[in-house]
Amino acid sequence: MVPDALKNYSLIKINITSLIGETVSEGNVENRIDLLVRELSDRLNTIIFIDETHLLVNKAGGMDFANMLKAGLDRGQIKMIGATTTEEYEQYILRDRAFLRRFQKIDVLEADKPTVVKILMGTLPKLE
């Protein structure tokens, strides 16, 4: 069951490994990221899902992606759900305080259907 406040939203999965890994030069990475961020900023009823969120601040070009997302996240133009392991969160995400403060940490033991609904309800006030 989808909460009423989320019924008009689309969820898009972004594959960071493909986005960053297929580029040849740093400038090419930045161009792809800039294009994606501009596209996401125009889609106000879209939530992006990024698995392996730690890659935003860990891989070549990743820091550029994290920095480019920050303004859109602050203004509410970009809405994001990220997933990573506790170890990777502590090793990478916690080091970037400016990126970290734009998120609410939710620990999930196993993502069954009732848990997913609870997570979405927990993020609902931030999306309204």
Residue map of PLM features:
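Short glycine-rich substrate-engagement loop in P-loop NTPases that contacts/grips substrate
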Residues: 10-41
